[in-house]
């Protein structure tokens, strides 16, 4: 019985990982409505992904230097179809793991939490540092 519980516990905490190419997006989208209903802010730790529900918390690691950033999925993009990328990071998130001039980087993407995933936020809310922290409460314990 204890062994089964241990195995189940381990499976629950195994994160889903994928390897992909990432880029960033910023000033041209500043203040505009994102696909999730939030107003985009380039200075917040967010990303655009077509593969994960809004509100999913991801750990994105630059494979070249092993620097990581924790981001929240708040947008979608046409980058996959046009350019073969899996994720676009906010300018702030990208600068945490690479120099802006690099443009495209190879990353590992891990799902950390889907506990606060959502369909759409009405009323054009602004995603703030306080809101970011609220998405991380599940993983901070």
Feature names for model-found ranges:
Residues 10-17:
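Hydrophobic core
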